[in-house]
Amino acid sequence: MTKVYIAGAIPEVGLNLLKEHFEVDMYDGEGLIDKETLKKGVEHADALISLLSTSVDKDIIDSANNLKIIANYGAGFNNIDVEYARQQNIDVTNTPHASTNATADLTIGLILSVARRIVEGDHLSRTTGFDGWAPLFFRGREVSGKTIGIIGLGEIGGAVAKRARAFDMDVLYTGPHRKEEKERDIGAKYVDLDTLLKNADFITINAAYNPSLHHMIDTEQFNKMKSTAYLINAGRGPIVNEQSLVEALDNKAIEGAALDVYEFEPEITDALKSFKNVVLTPHIGNATFEARDMMAKIVANDTIKKLNGDEPQFIVN
């Protein structure tokens, strides 16, 4: 019987779809799957459902004798050696679109949390408490009417821009290509990175990762930002040099930061945890019931298509 191996628990809606068609084995151990367990799991599998936290390198691919598809449960796919998979005639798919609203919502939530000191205020209220309302007490920054600079105006970046416009924000964006139709629809302005860094009050990273973006935001870029600016990263961790971010915060080169992704994920640079003006979330960009169920359906349906001889919808290689 055709076999599918899943590298970690996924929502039942996708799991049940797969079980209707194939023999399914799913890793259900404590923590993330280790390499040897994954190698053993894919040895006789026709399909692998991988997670963003699952490293699928050449060694893993070579361990699979029958593999036809790697369906990645996530919009990103930099955890997979997609080029080598193609050399082995293995399709790699992802789950685009499903993450858009959830991640855009979180991006705006991070902006509000760090600018209005919501997390800091929650901690104060639960611990020492406060003496009451006072004119100079616990001031933050308003979001309405400010300028947002979006790095990566793809689906998620575009959704962030639409939400920002509801706050009467001016929208700047940068990326490898200008998107004139989206500019007109949203009311955004295309600028180069330096112009964005110098003018934005909130800089959001919503780009997918590729090696050319490694440490795109480094000491030089922090030095170009306003001293009242905030950096928001809901894209990919390695786009930001976290040590340079720590130094920028130490030197008050920027006012604060909010991160959902990390350079050395799942490890978080310890120094970041000490700043009250930094909000940290555990990579929950698309962690909603709606998005995760949709992602499960996508990986299941693309796997079913491939193993039934049809072309998957979301091939990335």
Curated annotation (Swiss-Prot):
This is Putative 2-hydroxyacid dehydrogenase SERP1888. PROSITE patterns: D_2_HYDROXYACID_DH_3. The keyword Transmembrane does not apply. Keywords: NAD, Oxidoreductase. The keyword Heme does not apply. InterPro entries: D-2-hydroxyacid_DH (IPR050857), D-isomer_2_OHA_DH_cat_dom (IPR006139), D-isomer_DH_CS (IPR029753), D-isomer_DH_NAD-bd (IPR006140), NAD(P)-bd_dom_sf (IPR036291). NAD(+) binds at residues 155-156, 234-236, 260, 283-286. It comes from the Bacteria. Gene3D superfamilies: NAD(P)-binding Rossmann-like Domain. Pfam families: 2-Hacid_dh (PF00389), 2-Hacid_dh_C (PF02826). Belongs to the D-isomer specific 2-hydroxyacid dehydrogenase family. It comes from Staphylococcus epidermidis (strain ATCC 35984 / DSM 28319 / BCRC 17069 / CCUG 31568 / BM 3577 / RP62A).
